[in-house]
């Protein structure tokens, strides 16, 4: 490699080492052994392109031409980034438990073991061991759902939007579906109930007003082309004040009298009474079925605490129509999702232990007093490491559920707050936290970076992570 710097652009270009000479350099041998020739060659090509740009703009060679160890360092950094995982663990201390951008519900240890097992070994996904013949992939879930909800059967797809699309496509394509104007929700990403209706080939019939819908509104809208009335749980917003809605039991009776279906989209969905965790009670699939709803859909990765999935429960004959619809194959879940979902549902067989088994329930169950004790220990240990640039204090704050669930319900929590002091910058601190081995994601306020302690998984691990970050400042 060059140690003298030529003085013309042409000479500088000629002075750049060739790809073959770089690959033959003993300094790069460990990288070639670890990453392979193709990856190292691509990284070298990037460095050579940058070097040519430097020559064109500044008429000089890069420093690594005179110091091979610098090139090795650049390559190590680049290859490490190329081979790093973008989907990696982070600390969700944002104050939103079910954070859509951070993957929503954390899985239970039982679900993690179940997924690992079916990844490692063949599994009877569509095979009945007892009969020795082909089975259905939803069978692993069906028995559990029947016990937990009282449904005759169930169907599992990859999210609740898919569940709603499949329901409408299978039972109402080419016909009318009646929905209250107050329930025409947008579920995120500009994805709205009318859009799903249109995609399913249904005609949306709006009834009532935004804040008030009565039984007579539904009665007057039913025609010979009506396939169903659809109830949509407004889980991601709340209308209060001068309001009126028709209960499912009354609509169920109307639908039976008029020979049409009653279907329900519960959105986030829940199988247990959440009031013991300080949350509002959510309508459950079992309650909807008891009220006469024919098909109910809900999410698996929100309040249920499982993997991303959409569940549809209801009458056997209707579920059979869903299972045989062409969309079902396109929307079906793989063995990893089904294994995690089965493990999650098993926890619900013993609802008294949910706060010990499901991470989301454990977070709901924590008291503010417990969180304050954790905060005091962290503050005492970390304050000396962040002084004098940052001060630490504990503040009372509120945690929200997230993912469109219970938008007007908050749990009392404790925040560990960092305040900028002598030369400190909250913007730089936030970036520093995001560059940790396990990035720490908090919430930036006007004058503080707040870590909501309700999101902690392991106090000792978080202390170690933050201590390292403090030392690195």
UniProtKB/Swiss-Prot annotation:
Its EC number(s): 2.9.1.1
Family matches, as SUPFAM superfamilies: PLP-dependent transferases
Enzymatic class: transferase
Cofactor annotation: pyridoxal 5'-phosphate
GO cellular-component term (any): cytoplasm
Modified residues (N6-(pyridoxal phosphate)lysine): 302
Similarity comment text for this entry: Belongs to the SelA family.
Known role: Converts seryl-tRNA(Sec) to selenocysteinyl-tRNA(Sec) required for selenoprotein biosynthesis.
Pathway(s) where this gene product acts: Aminoacyl-tRNA biosynthesis; selenocysteinyl-tRNA(Sec) biosynthesis; selenocysteinyl-tRNA(Sec) from L-seryl-tRNA(Sec) (bacterial route): step 1/1
A GO molecular-function descriptor: L-seryl-tRNA(Sec) selenium transferase activity
Protein origin, superkingdom: Bacteria
NCBIfam families according to UniProt: selA
Cellular compartment(s): Cytoplasm
Source organism of the structure: Shewanella oneidensis (strain ATCC 700550 / JCM 31522 / CIP 106686 / LMG 19005 / NCIMB 14063 / MR-1)
Gene that encodes the chain: selA
One Gene Ontology biological process: selenocysteine incorporation
HAMAP family hit by this protein: SelA
Entry protein name: L-seryl-tRNA(Sec) selenium transferase
Keywords: Cytoplasm, Protein biosynthesis, Pyridoxal phosphate, Selenium, Transferase
InterPro entries, alphabetized: PyrdxlP-dep_Trfase, PyrdxlP-dep_Trfase_major, SelA-like, SelA_trans, SelA_trans_N_dom
Record's catalysed reaction(s): L-seryl-tRNA(Sec) + selenophosphate + H(+) = L-selenocysteinyl-tRNA(Sec) + phosphate
């Amino acid at each position: 490699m060059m140690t003298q710097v030529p003085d013309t652009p042409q000479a500088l270009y000629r002075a750049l080492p060739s790809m073959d000479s770089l690959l033959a350099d003993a300094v790069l041998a460990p990288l070639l052994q670890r990453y392979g020739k193709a990856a190292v060659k691509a990284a070298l090509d990037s460095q050579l392109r940058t070097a040519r740009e430097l020559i064109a703009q500044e008429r000089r060679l890069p420093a690594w031409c005179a110091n091979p160890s610098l090139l090795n360092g650049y390559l190590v950094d680049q290859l490490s980034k190329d081979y790093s995982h973008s989907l990696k663990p982070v600390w969700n201390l944002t104050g939103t438990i079910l954070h859509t951008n951070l993957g929503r519900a954390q899985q239970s240890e039982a679900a993690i073991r179940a997924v690992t097992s079916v990844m490692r070994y063949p599994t009877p996904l569509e095979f009945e061991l007892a009969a020795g013949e082909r089975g259905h992939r939803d069978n692993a879930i069906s028995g559990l759902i029947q016990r937990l909800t009282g449904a005759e059967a169930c169907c599992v797809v990859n999210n609740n939007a898919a569940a709603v699309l499949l329901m409408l496509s299978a039972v109402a394509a080419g016909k009318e579906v009646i929905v209250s104007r107050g329930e025409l929700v947008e579920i995120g990403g500009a994805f709205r109930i009318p859009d799903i209706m249109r995609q399913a080939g249904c005609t949306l019939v709006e009834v009532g007003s935004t804040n008030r819908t009565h039984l007579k509104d539904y009665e007057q809208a039913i025609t010979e082309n009506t396939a169903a009335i659809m109830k949509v749980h407004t889980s991601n917003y709340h209308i209060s004040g001068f309001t009126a809605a028709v209960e499912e039991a009354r609509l169920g009776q109307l639908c039976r009298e008029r020979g049409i279906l009653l279907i329900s989209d519960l959105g986030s969905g829940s199988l247990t009474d959440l009031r013991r965790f300080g949350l509002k009670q959510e309508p459950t699939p079992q309650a909807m079925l008891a009220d006469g709803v024919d098909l109910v859909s809900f999410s698996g990765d929100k309040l249920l605490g499982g993997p991303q999935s959409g569940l549809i429960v209801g009458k056997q004959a209707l579920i059979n129509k869903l299972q045989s619809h062409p969309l079902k194959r396109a929307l079906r879940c793989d063995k990893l999702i089904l294994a995690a979902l089965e493990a999650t549902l098993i926890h619900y067989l013993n609802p008294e232990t949910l706060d010990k088994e499901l991470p989301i329930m454990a977070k709901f169950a924590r008291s503010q007093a417990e969180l304050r004790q954790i905060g005091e220990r962290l503050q005492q240990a970390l304050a000396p490491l962040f002084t004098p640039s940052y001060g630490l204090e504990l503040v009372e704050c509120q945690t929200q559920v997230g993912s469109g669930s219970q938008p007007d319900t908050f749990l009392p929590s404790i925040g560990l707050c960092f305040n900028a002091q002598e030369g400190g910058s909250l913007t730089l601190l936030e970036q520093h936290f995001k560059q940790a081995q396990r990035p720490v994601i908090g919430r930036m306020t006007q004058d503080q970076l707040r870590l909501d302690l309700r999101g902690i998984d392991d106090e000792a691990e978080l202390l170690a992570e933050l201590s390292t970050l403090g030392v690195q400042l």
